[in-house]
C-alpha cells in the first residue's frame, strides 16, 4: 500500500509529526496499533515500525518519529516533503485497550506517547465511567510531545488525569519530577483492579513490569510495548 505525505510539523528536538493520506485505503485500525513503513535504500529494503498517533477515521493517519542522524531510515523519512509517497504495511499490533475497559494507568516515555494519544482521543468519550491516568516521562520540558493536546484532553474530560514528569527539570518547572516508575506506583496505590499500559524504551518497560510484579499486580493487567 502507498501513502502520500500531506503535512508535517516539528513537535520536539529532532522529533516530527507526519500526516499521511493513504492511497486506496481507509484508515481502519484499532487505536494503539502501528504501521510498518518500507523503502528501498541502496541495495536493501528497510522497514521501520511506527505507532499511529491519530484516531481512526477517513484515509488519513499520523505518525511521530525521531531523527537518528546516522540511522538508515529516519534521515530518508525526514527528507520527505508534502506530495512524496511511501510504501507501508499494516496495521499490526495487540497494544490496544482491553475489553471490557477498566480504569487504566498509561505509562509512556519519549515517542512511547504515540499509541496513547490515539487511544485517548478515540476512546475517552466512549468510557466516561472509567478513569484514565497518563504518566508521561521525559528528560526536558521540550520533550513533552503533544503536551498541549494532552492538557486540552485533561481539561475537557473529567475522567482523564495527565501527569507529566521530568528527570531534568528547569528551575521554573512546578510539576512532577523523577522517573515514571515511582509515579506509577503512587497512582496505583493499593488498587489491583487497574490495567497498566506501558510503552517506551526496553529498559524502562522491563523495570516497570518488574516493579508491578513485586507489588502483586496480576500479569494479565500489564499490557506493554517496548522498543530499542
Where are the model-predicted features located?
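A short, basic/flexible loop-to-alpha-helix module at the beginning of a structural domain
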Residues: 89-100
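Phosphate-handling active-site elements
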Residues: 125-131
Amino acid at each position: 500500500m502507498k501513502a502520500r505525505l500531506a503535512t508535517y510539523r516539528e513537535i520536539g528536538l529532532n522529533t516530527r509529526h507526519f500526516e499521511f493520506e493513504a492511497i486506496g485505503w481507509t484508515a481502519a485500525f484499532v487505536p494503539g496499533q502501528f504501521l510498518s513503513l518500507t523503502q528501498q535504500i541502496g541495495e536493501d529494503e528497510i522497514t521501520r515500525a511506527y505507532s499511529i498517533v491519530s484516531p481512526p477515521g477517513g484515509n488519513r493517519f499520523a505518525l511521530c518519529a525521531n531523527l537518528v542522524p546516522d540511522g538508515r531510515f529516519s534521515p530518508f523519512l525526514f527528507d520527505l516533503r508534502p506530495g512524496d509517497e511511501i510504501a507501508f504495511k499494516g496495521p499490526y499490533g495487540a497494544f490496544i485497550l482491553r475489553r471490557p475497559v477498566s480504569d487504566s494507568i498509561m505509562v509512556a516515555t519519549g515517542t512511547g506517547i504515540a499509541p496513547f494519544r490515539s487511544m485517548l482521543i478515540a476512546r475517552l468519550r466512549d468510557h466516561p465511567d472509567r478513569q484514565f491516568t497518563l504518566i508521561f516521562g521525559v528528560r526536558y520540558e521540550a520533550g513533552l510531545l503533544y503536551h498541549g493536546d494532552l492538557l486540552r484532553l485533561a481539561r475537557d474530560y473529567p475522567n482523564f488525569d495527565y501527569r507529566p514528569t521530568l528527570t531534568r527539570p528547569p528551575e521554573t518547572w512546578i510539576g512532577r519530577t523523577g522517573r515514571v516508575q515511582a509515579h506509577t506506583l503512587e497512582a496505583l496505590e493499593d488498587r489491583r483492579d487497574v490495567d497498566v499500559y506501558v510503552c517506551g524504551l526496553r529498559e524502562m518497560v522491563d523495570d516497570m513490569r518488574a516493579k508491578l510484579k513485586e507489588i502483586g499486580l496480576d500479569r494479565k493487567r500489564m499490557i506493554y510495548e517496548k522498543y530499542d
